[in-house]
């Protein structure tokens, strides 16, 4: 969990308050992290709660984390009363824990969550790729968020466990993209496979041309990734024409994007915006 909280302990679903709902809960189940977001009735993300994605965890674990998140959001009161929630939506790329998370949500809130789907996405955006069903839900949501909030054509960079690039053409169609190892994934591979390379934190090196192993690794991962992104953008833009919007999101974007030469907008809530647009 990401903040210290002591929510009231309850063993089953919580009593709900009277009146209209206080907003929506959106869960993004990613390969490394589960992010729980609270959106108000107007669609504004008010707060988020993070926990690690661990496939072997139990329903009880997810119940505890959900209660802690709701308490942190101000939806679970000290007396154990839960404010009414309009709906709960899940976007997941980790099917192994979907059933556990679903049961935890039902146990705590009494609400059966809706899973963001390809059908939801296709109501908002035209997907012009082979086998749309194989496209990750995170990339679908990113594309919808970019199209609805920034317009077309657009390039979307999502920097998580993998670094993905999505492309929306001038007609507003999603036409494909690229998938590469993520920043932390690359670093982990280096330290795992090369016995003399240490595990490091992602920080800007003191010198661009590294003067020791630490600086060399930091420079390689930060400036190397930034240069890769710039290079991919340079190759994509000629296929899209003018006035291309470039948007970055994901947990690792803030480490790298400021070192890119292109003008790139960082929108940390892009995926949630897309999910809300597709499931409203």
Regions found by a protein language model. Name each.
Residues 24-28, 89, 154-158, 247:
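Short glycine-aspartate micro-motif
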Residues 2, 23-68, 173-198:
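Short glycine-rich, Thr/Ser-proximal phosphate-binding strand/loop in the N-terminal lobe
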Residues 66-87, 232-244:
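Phosphate/pyrophosphate-binding loops at sites that engage ATP/ADP/AMP, CoA/4′-phosphopantetheine
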Residues 195, 264-280:
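Glycine-rich phosphate-binding/hydrolytic loop that grips phosphoryl groups
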Residues 55, 205-245, 252, 263:
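Adenine-nucleotide phosphate-binding core of ATP-dependent small-molecule kinases
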Residues 1-23:
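Intrinsic disorder/low-complexity segments
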Residues 111-115, 124-193, 223-232:
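Phosphate-binding/catalytic loop of phosphoryl-transfer enzymes
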Residues 33, 91-98, 242-260:
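Glycine-rich phosphate-binding loops at beta-strand->alpha-helix junctions
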